[in-house]
Amino acid sequence: MVATSFKLNNGLEIPAVGLGTWQSKAGEVKAAVSYALQIGYKLIDGAYCYGNEDEVGEGLKEAFAAGVKREDIFVVTKIWATYNTRVVLGLDKSLRSLGLDYVDLLLVHWPVLLNPEGNHDKFPTLPDGKRDVIWDYNHVDGWKQMEAVLATGKTKSIGVSNYSKKYLEQLLPHATVIPAVNQIENHPSLPQQEIVDFCKEKGIHIMAYSPLGSTGSPLMSADPVVKIAEKKGISPTTVLLSYHVNRGSTVLAKSVTPARIKANLEIVDLDDEDMKLLNDYSNDLASKGELKRYVYPPFGIDFGFPDKS
C-alpha cells in the first residue's frame, strides 16, 4: 500500500503529499489553501520569498474556522537568502503573515547570503544588475542560527533546501542537529540520484518540488509516463506525483484549481516495472547530457549540482 506519511529523523511524521504555493497568484492562494485542507491535505508548503504568506495565513484561518485542527496539519516555510544571518527575524515575519505561533518545518531556502542591507528586501542587486551576493558567507554559520531557533519552539523541525551532496558534506560535520529534510527540484528528467541516495544514507528526508518539471513540461508526454498512465488508467500527473512517493519522498503538488487540487491527492503504487521504466528514462537523459533543471536562480554560484557544475 502506498505511503501516506513518512517519519523524519526527529520522530515527527511528514505527509507524503503537500500543496505547494510557489508562483500561485495573488487572490487565488487563500481559497486554494483553505480548500486543500478541508478535503484532506495535511501539508502546506510556503516561503517568505513567495510573497503570498499573508494569503496562505488567510487560507489557514478559514480552514481552522471550518474545523481543521492546527495540530493535524504540517506547515513549512523557508528563510530567504537575505535573512540567512537573521533567522529569527525571518521566521517571525513568516509567523506573523501565517497567523501561527510555530511552523512544523523551517528550511534554509538557498545556501547563499544576499546582502541584508542591499537595495531590495529579497533580491538586492549591484549597479551592473547582478545579484548582491555576500561572497565570504559560510552557510554552516547560517545553520547554527537554524539550530538556535529550533530551541525556541517556533519551529518543530529544521532542514535545508536546494542543497547538493557537496554542500551537505560541508555542513554535516559541524551540525549538532542533522537537517530533517532537503527540499529539491525532482522529477524523472532531474532525478538527482546522487543527493537522494546521500540523504537517505544520512537520514535526511527528501521533499520534491516541481515534480512535473515545468508548465508545458515534455515529461507529461514522455513515453514511459504515458505508457504507465495508460496501463493503470490514471493521468500522467498522477504517475509523476506517485513516482516520488514510491521513492520514499514527499511530493509538493501545486495548483489553485479545485479539481486539480483534489486530483493531485491521488497517489498510486508503482510496481518495479513501472519504476524501471522511469529510471531508465532518467538514465537515458543523463547519458545524453539532457537532464533538465528548471529552477536555478542567477546567484552566480556553483552549488555543486553535477548537472550544473
Curated annotation (Swiss-Prot):
Gene3D superfamilies: NADP-dependent oxidoreductase domain. Coiled coil: none annotated. SUPFAM superfamilies: NAD(P)-linked oxidoreductase (SSF51430). The active site is at Y50. Its EC number is 1.1.1.365. The lineage of its organism: Eukaryota, Fungi, Dikarya, Ascomycota, Pezizomycotina. This is D-galacturonate reductase. Belongs to the aldo/keto reductase family. The gene is gar1. PANTHER family: ALDO/KETO REDUCTASE (PTHR11732). Substrate binds at H109. InterPro entries: AKR, AKR3D, Aldo/ket_reductase_CS, NADP_OxRdtase_dom, NADP_OxRdtase_dom_sf. It holds the Pfam family Aldo_ket_red. The keyword Oxidoreductase applies.
